[in-house]
Amino acid sequence: MVQLTEETYLYDPNLLLKLDFHRSPANFKPFISAANPGEPWMKVRPLKDTDYDRGFLQLLSQLTHVGNVNRTQFLTRFSQMKASGDYFVTVIEDTRKNEIIGAASLVIERKFIHNCAVRGRLEDVVVNDTYRGKQLGKLIVVTVSLLAEELGCYKMSLDCKDKLIKFYESLGYVAIPGNSNSMTIRYDEGPTLKRNATSAGSSGTVGDSCQTVSLDFAS
């Protein structure tokens, strides 16, 4: 394994410390949050440029086809996402194994409507098969949903399978009438991203969207 001496976050990890999990309708038993994920060896954080070596792409392959992405391609896409400021890929790490075990992406869409508001999309949600039952599905979705609110999104949208509608309803999402399996959660409208989300070198960023949400667990 290549030894990496310097690591870069996709966005400012301090944003996650601001999230108030008591604002979510999710029912955690026991209560957990991004700051306290339930186990001392778990850490919720932004994606790092070194996560290529922590199995991030292998985890995504449990969700959908990833392809043969080499290190250079990974780092190039990471840099593009960071530079754009509109991608907030968030992961859960098992620090005992130095392995990524959960992930979800918030993609920011900039609008002219609603006074040039910003909207969030929840995408690429996945939890390692062997870690089911630890509420990690709820944890990663609620983390990214609260992050969207923190960043000033007026709403967050997702697409899901039939069997996951109840799961997302339990987290505050509602089905969009006449729009198949699209769901949304609305926040107080905010016209722009908060300044701390786009501050120097610590923000996430824009690019093309990937696969939408597809979870295969019920917790």
Curated annotation (Swiss-Prot):
Name of the protein described by the UniProt record: Probable glucosamine 6-phosphate N-acetyltransferase
Gene name for this UniProt entry: Gnpnat
Amino-acid positions noted as binding acetyl-CoA in the UniProt annotation, renumbered to this chain: 133-138
EC numbers for this chain: 2.3.1.4
Binding-site positions, substrate: 64, 111-114, 123-125, 154-155, 186
GO cellular component terms attached to this protein's record: cytoplasm
Catalytic activity as recorded in UniProt: D-glucosamine 6-phosphate + acetyl-CoA = N-acetyl-D-glucosamine 6-phosphate + CoA + H(+)
Domain N-acetyltransferase: 42-198
A Pfam family this chain is assigned to: Acetyltransf_1
PROSITE patterns: GNAT (PS51186)
Family: Belongs to the acetyltransferase family. GNA1 subfamily.
CDD domains listed in its UniProt record: NAT_SF
